[in-house]
Amino acid sequence: MNPSVDALRATFGNAIGRALVARDGETIVTVGRDGLLGVMRWLRDTAGHSYDYLVDVTAVEYRDAERPIELVYFLRSLERRADLRVKVELPKEQELALDSVVGLWAGADWLEREVYDMFGVTFRGHPDLRRILMWETYAEGYPLRKDFPLRGRFSRAEQVRQALGANPEAHYSMEELSIAEAFAELPEDMKQRLRQGERGKIPFSE
């Protein structure tokens, strides 16, 4: 067991939950969401611990709908060559939000954005919390949540609108845009623009 766990318990008491040693030998300690920022600052700044490098931030959702979403922070002390994982549980019936650690480790910026993008977890105090893998206007959910369909979820009509909006003079084939069956959903002006395209033909019944 990583000795930082006993030091955390002595300092933060009940804010520190269970701890275990994973199969790879690393210690995982669970921390209450409200005390996360204080614990992380202590781990970074306290002599003899000094976790100065945030390796990763990720999230896990299990098949059991009753289990909370888990946020996992991978910390590394470069000076001591020691690793520690800090885990926070977020019950799904509560707000999926907790404090950002960007103020402690600048590298958390993109890591937290990815968790937000894929799982919908909000990080309070993040300087620029927006999607990072999906496009910013994507509004079809969070792709790594268990309720997200394996086939994905997107609007083909919206895909075409964005493509034509970015380059209205371009010609697109139906193979490129994959919207043949969504043609009827498009507004009339866009249908006309697509009909005038030089590449590909659109099946329509008018």
Task: Label the model's feature ranges.
Residues M1-E206:
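Terminal low-complexity/charged segments
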